[in-house]
């Protein structure tokens, strides 16, 4: 995994196989070796330059030409590489790239500023982070302010792994503070460095008669990387089970994802709704879903 930040460059490189470990057995997540990619060719609208952009998706090797919404039936992976269509204007966003590593590939995740210019009149700048996750994006993107609401987060999953394994490399931007830049708003600073993150949440989900989705948090792994590293191979991170709030190493950001941070999922009516985490489960509870996210920034969307 590589992360890059184009502000001063923050990169995270994921070079896996990404795998889950349980009971002395290691199981690689499908396409988690990152050696196969779908290549998409998207032509942006004439008003913003009619440039053809290349988008990369983790999945069985293929090339797709044309501005069609993408959904991979074979791969469980989604990313921040998406096609957007706002007010009739088509735009492609690219922040995840395949990159050669040894005999195969890794993923390079970047954080940087994207500019959109129209006819030399409008110049919109947005801070974009690179993310690779289990789930899918509901293309085309319609705005930049409701990112989670456009993602189906997580996949059905019923195991209880003890840890997550992957290779990674980090290059931070070197800037002492993050920036806030969401389009037409003025650029501002947020205290503290930007850091790549990894989130793994094991949940027990259910749906009520009105289509609301609720969840208990069964397992938790939250990592924030605050230092530059060369390649770290076979890094092994322990998944914590049950209520972790009494642990000495507990941080508030490891808790329930609520409000603007709530993850979404499709209900039985086909509507993407918030997954409302309402309590802590135990290691004995059934697991129904896993959320797994690798992001180049913990604050690019702030």
Residue ranges and their predicted role:
Residues 1-28:
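Bacterial Sec-dependent N-terminal signal peptides
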């Amino acid at each position: 995994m590589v992360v890059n930040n184009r502000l001063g460059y923050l990169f995270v490189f994921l070079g896996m196989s990404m795998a889950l470990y349980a009971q002395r057995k290691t199981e690689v997540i499908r396409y988690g070796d990152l050696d196969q990619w779908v290549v998409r060719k998207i032509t942006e609208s004439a008003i913003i330059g009619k440039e053809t952009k290349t988008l990369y998706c983790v999945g069985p090797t293929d090339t797709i030409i044309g501005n069609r919404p993408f959904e991979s039936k074979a791969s469980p992976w989604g990313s921040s590489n998406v096609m957007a269509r706002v007010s009739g204007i088509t735009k492609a966003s690219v922040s995840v790239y395949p990159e050669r590593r040894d005999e195969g590939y890794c993923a390079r995740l970047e954080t940087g500023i994207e500019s959109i210019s129209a006819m030399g009149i409008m110049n919109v700048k947005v801070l974009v982070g690179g993310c690779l996750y289990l789930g899918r994006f509901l293309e085309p993107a319609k705005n930049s302010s409701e990112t989670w609401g456009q993602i189906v987060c997580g996949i059905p999953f019923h195991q209880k792994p003890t840890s997550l394994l992957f290779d990674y490399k980090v290059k931070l931007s070197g800037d002492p503070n993050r920036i806030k830049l969401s389009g037409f708003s003025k650029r501002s600073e947020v205290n503290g460095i930007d850091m790549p993150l990894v989130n793994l949440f094991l949940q027990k989900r259910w749906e009520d008669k009105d289509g609301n989705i609720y969840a208990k948090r069964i397992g938790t792994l939250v990592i924030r990387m605050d230092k530059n590293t060369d390649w770290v191979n076979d890094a092994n991170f322990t998944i914590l089970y049950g209520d972790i709030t009494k642990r000495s190493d507990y941080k508030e950001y490891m808790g329930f994802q609520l409000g603007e941070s709530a993850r979404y999922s499709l209900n039985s009516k086909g509507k993407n709704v918030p997954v409302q985490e309402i309590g802590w489960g135990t290691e004995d509870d059934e697991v129904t879903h896993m959320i797994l996210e690798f992001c180049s920034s913990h604050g690019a969307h702030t």
